[in-house]
Amino acid sequence: QIKGLYVTQITEDGDLAVLSGSNQFSVSDKVIRGGVKIQKRDLETGDTKPQGSATLKDTAFDIISLNDNSVLVEGKLYKKNEVVKTIRTDIEGIASTSSDLLPYGKFRIVESEAPDGYLTDGAKPIDFTITENGKIVDLTDEAHSIYNQIKRGDIEGVKIGAGTHKRLADVPFRITSKTTGENHVVVTDDNGQFSTSADWASHKHNTNAGKTSEDGVWFGTSEPDDSKGALPYDTYIIEEMRCDSNKGFELIPPFEIVVSRNN
């Protein structure tokens, strides 16, 4: 018969706790450990494929402990609200830990670094719990993925006749994505100006009709949004197209423009 009170503290990961005194006995209990897998998606499309020349690769996620007691991860103890591990996504936008990284308990995934071409704004944290040994908690479905907004910008310009400095109206320019090949046409107004900005012409007005300067422009498969730029993060080729207005003039050679900053 064991009498008296035995008090001990387990501070290291292991299978065996030994209580010593006038009597000695051992208790063996293995800690439940699991892992987590998360998916990065495009906010506008909901897809696991990026827009333009952006990428979902190398998104950084911090895994934070929400446990009142310290947890042991890779040989180190972490307190509540401390980052226990940072993981990064692969080319498919998936990041995963091993199946035994995290001990039993509650954790949170927070995006700490956005991938190239995306904003960190709007990326919501995801909470999850480790309850089964050797199981990787799957957060790759649409309901649990973490979403990012693609950077979007606009292009504007002025068409002037060489030698005359006269501004040319109704001149079409084709804008083509170097990554996807998607292309749309913008047309200069009476002052020889063109722009893809919603302040110039709503993205929603005759979207991509390309007939007049008042037709809106929008690249991508998501619904046009006047609060955003028309062109996703990418490199674009601008080509002047032949028309009556530029008849007799040599066309401007095609040139490239990079959209890399939001708005």
What are these regions (language model features)?
Residues 1-263:
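Solvent-exposed loop/turn and edge beta-strand elements of beta-rich ligand-binding domains
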